[in-house]
Curated annotation (Swiss-Prot):
Entry keyword annotation includes Metal-binding: yes
Gene name, Swiss-Prot/TrEMBL: ERI3
Disulfide-bonded cysteines: none
Keyword terms of this UniProt record: Exonuclease, Hydrolase, Magnesium, Metal-binding, Nuclease
Protein name, UniProt field: ERI1 exoribonuclease 3
Swiss-Prot/TrEMBL cofactor(s): Mg(2+)
Entry binding sites for AMP: E152, H307
Provenance organism: Homo sapiens (Human)
Cofactor binding summary note: Binds 2 magnesium ions per subunit.
Origin: domain of life: Eukaryota
Catalytic residues, chain numbering: E152, H307
Enzyme class (EC, first level): hydrolase
Amino acid sequence: MATASPAADGGRGRPWEGGLVSWPPAPPLTLPWTWMGPSWGQHPGHWGFPALTEPSASPAAGLGIFEVRRVLDASGCSMLAPLQTGAARFSSYLLSRARKVLGSHLFSPCGVPEFCSISTRKLAAHGFGASMAAMVSFPPQRYHYFLVLDFEATCDKPQIHPQEIIEFPILKLNGRTMEIESTFHMYVQPVVHPQLTPFCTELTGIIQAMVDGQPSLQQVLERVDEWMAKEGLLDPNVKSIFVTCGDWDLKVMLPGQCQYLGLPVADYFKQWINLKKAYSFAMGCWPKNGLLDMNKGLSLQHIGRPHSGIDDCKNIANIMKTLAYRGFIFKQTSKPF
């Protein structure tokens, strides 16, 4: 655990020249402060801001990274302090502007999300531009992109066999911003049980007209591959992984139907993150009711219709963004085939 004095830089406030110091320089204190969460991925409570830039500043002068960390003062009181880190110098003009704008919110007893929200609004309102308005950042993830997937399949009570995929949605989620960058969404014509049951329509909201005349699974898989290539996801230098709500989609449904139809399963479908497991690691409890429990546990509103594949993907993406915002690092949960 590292310690730093608010006056460690002689009150000049230049963190690029000597470790981490408070920004702006705090009044001199005789007792040191203890910084909690020295690096991302090791300690929760480490929050960051992406590079801040201004159109009027040169790249060399306008780059910088801000972090928000919870600290304890000598009396044991907890507070938040933003820091500037990184090798690049931050324009003194921009730094002074940001200091004036944030003012009393620099040391605030509020929680990290509230602090970030206040800071974002104040900085954006004073003309810091789009990058500043979206300055809340996330811990570095292991993947450049997350591919959120949630199948809907033919079903009935009692269950029919084999089940067939009838909705095939994928959201391309940027691993740095946790924002959706692209969407793949197709309905699939079932061939073994071409007529949807009333139970299936009631559960998924998919009616017969939505699947009649649609491409077969083989054709949809070919289009998925084309979409993956177009999005740069097949580049060996780009790390991506699928994310599902459970193991059923990629451990049972897709390989089972492909085996039945004699179709190969692409390698990129053979590793994934089970969001239920990720959530349980992050929150310490298992979401028995899947997305409903995860949304409730994170105080999120459910998006769209339950058991709509594309809406379920949006909920998964929203849950991932919230967990990432809290500092969670997503890791592969599936075992190699």
